[in-house]
Amino acid sequence: PRLARHLAPADALALDAVPVGRAGRQLVVATCRPDRAGRIHAALDLPQGQEALITVAPRAQITATQIALYGERLARLAEGQAPQRHSCRGWRPARASGAFGLLATLSALVALLVPATLVAAVFGLALIVFLGNTALKAAAYATTLRADRRRVPATGTDPPDPGQNGPVFSILVPLYREPEIATTLLDRLARLDYPRERLEVLLVVEQDDTVTRAVLATAKLPGWVRVITVPQGHPRTKPRALNFALGFARGEIIGIYDAEDRPEPDQLSRVARRFAAAGSETACLQGRLDYYNARHNLLSRLFAIEYAIWFRVLLPGVQRMGLAVPLGGTTLFLRRAALEAVGGWDAHNVTEDAELGLRLARNGYRTEVIATTTFEEANAAVLPWIRQRARWQKGYLMTWAVAMRSPCALWRDLGPGRFVAMQAQILFAVLGFLLAPLLWSLAVKPFGVAHPLDAVVGPLGYGVLATLFVASVCLSIAIALRATRAPHLRGLRPVIPLSELYFLLATLSAWRAAAEMLLRPFWWAKTRHGAFGGTVAATAGPADVTDPTPSRPLPSGARRRRWRGAP
């Protein structure tokens, strides 16, 4: 602590310097950038008459010493880095439980007094959510179809490969209890075809994760890879670790990968070219995600189809419509200046990616979906799948609840159209699964079984509902067929009709997410990697199969349009 007072943490990180001791009356300061000696001297807070002695040390040693000296203070900053009005750290489960209890009591009272009214209201809400989700899906699909038909193959639209003049990338890879996959990860990242002097990879590990730290300690790390050890604290989440590591990154572009990821080798070059061509308002590029173990079992096949639908059809459509883009947790690349301007990640949100995408949109930034793919490991067992999906859905609910604390501000930031669309994108995405059993109950009507809705819905009404449900299923199948055009995905098409059954699991996870909102709002359900093929060779699998879709970044239909009617 006595050494730390001579150099502020922010200055130490910015200057790649750290006080390490004393030599007589001189303060010894180590740095890996001796060219910054003058700036280091200027930043030091020394008593009158005391001097500093600058010494040179490797960057990895500088980083480790900075963490030892400033780590606890930086960790506390990481926990509260996001602006209070955008953060869920003020979420009070007891207050939410009280509101839920009051709602349940009122519902029970209505059920006793006017049961038909309650039935009509609940089923009406379920139908509104269903129609909202279907409309958003249809609009995104139609937008993607129109754009694909107009698309011209890439012929040098973006600048040439930046080579040695490209931006410096800092790739953050959070690891927690990943001893089996850590060495495989290094092999996969080594395939990235980008100048090493303009690339650094920060492996972010928790202080108490002794197993992963031991594996990394024995690994032979290249000079462009560093280990960042995050001090213990609360909450123990991925966004907290990312906030902590951000201060140690030196790149102007911040990229995020997960432990099991295998990005395409030219991914960073594509991202660099697109950032060079896009304006400064384009703050984020989101890559596509796919699975290298899609054929592990039926669940992994259906999961791969869902990912193809999301990243190859719906998300590009959402982007072209000018709506807020809920980011994926990996293969996203951010301009550092924009990331810092919006306050980094919310350390308490367990779906930090979607929340950050919304916050970028609220601050006037754009996100583009870029046609480059990272292959990762599909969760191929039912219970782990439900745990993972519940975490995502809990984060969506939390993101919506925080944003709607001030609906007028959200309306002002997004505009009317994007405000309405956000309700479907975030709230309806979870509410649809919570209420789905109500709509499933209508399946008994073709068999002449009585239903509580019979009092308010006649035969014609049931016919209209049946038509809507069949049309929705047909739309989903059409989107899935479109999403699986790539050669390595076509083999998944025979199981597309089973997707409706697959989403039954999402209803189970949605109810678990709702319960966790009240009981364990900040708990991070860890996804285990390596159990379903995550440790296969770096070059194996479908990543080497040519994808027929052009590598050109997807154009945006937004172009700074704000939906005060249409974004």
Where are these regions (language model features)?
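Polyanionic, low-complexity intrinsically disordered segments
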Residues: 1-47, 59
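Long helical/loop segments within the catalytic core of UDP-sugar-dependent glycosyltransferases
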Residues: 217-252, 265-350, 390-401, 502
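Catalytic donor-sugar/metal-binding loop of nucleotide-sugar-dependent glycosyltransferases
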Residues: 357-375
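Cell-envelope/extracellular polymer assembly enzymes that use nucleotide-activated donors
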Residues: 167-170, 200, 340, 355
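Cytosolic-side membrane-insertion boundary helix
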Residues: 65-103
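Acidic donor-binding segment of Leloir-type glycosyltransferases
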Residues: 190-233
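N-terminal signal-anchor transmembrane helix
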Residues: 135-197
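Membrane-embedded multi-pass helical conduit in multi-pass membrane proteins
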Residues: 110-161, 424-519
